[in-house]
Amino acid sequence: MQSGGGGNGGYTNGRVRAIIGAKIFGKELIRLFFDTHAHYDDEWFDGDRDELIASLPAAGVELVVNCGCDKKSSEASIALAERYDFFYAAVGWHPHDARTWSCESADLIRAWAMREKVVAIGEIGLDYHYDKEWKDTQFEVLEAQLCLAEELDLPVIIHDREAHGDCMDHVRRHPNVRGEFHCYSGSAEMAKELLDRGWYLGFNGSITMQGARKAVETLKLMPSDRILLETDCPYLAPMPRIDGRRNDSRKLKRVAEFIAEILGTTPELVAQTAMENGRRFFGIA
């Protein structure tokens, strides 16, 4: 599963941009991070949203994709993307919100997809941790959105919690759909199939937590050109949570440091490679 460049998934011969600005990793680097999965529309940010977002570029954050979960949050994601130059939007129905899918939802996604800064359909998928009794509804809503992704030629962002087998069945039924499994928690074997299909895997603060053994082992085997960094903020702040439970894009630095230690490379190279991967995945020049 290695892709060029020898060990550590091809990191050894990688390239780091020389850019001066904010102090990141103890060096003069700026605009190094791409947070490929955030939820800045969440009410946890209501008290300081604008101030926090305005602070991100100086903290090294170059790009953010804000992900929708239903009609309201998808529209909020678009609004954030149209307000902030470095924000983009993904739109769709999360499995927790599958029951709010209606006959107009597909047409809404088609209309949203026409907006310049909508780059993906997401966050979509299956979740059996809380909502297994709504399994059939989740299936129908995921299937509808995968069909839309193929129709609209947009990548998908998959939420997969305790539903690995069924999520993979949906992926196999749509070989022309490209996508990413965010907050990857599957096996190395599942990762290999996804990578063989051209998919990407997203990693966030959950990889720093106890019980993340499968994600760590998967990372060790992955080609570097399929790794995406994300926060899922305001959730899943990396450990140790010395500055509180609320997550934000500035904490990608700690995720990059953790991954670099696993792979035997530098945090700068992890961040820069993930930046290039994210731009390629979402089609952002």
What are these regions (language model features)?
Residues G4-G6, Y11, R15, I19-A285:
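Mid-domain alpha/beta scaffold segments of enzyme catalytic cores
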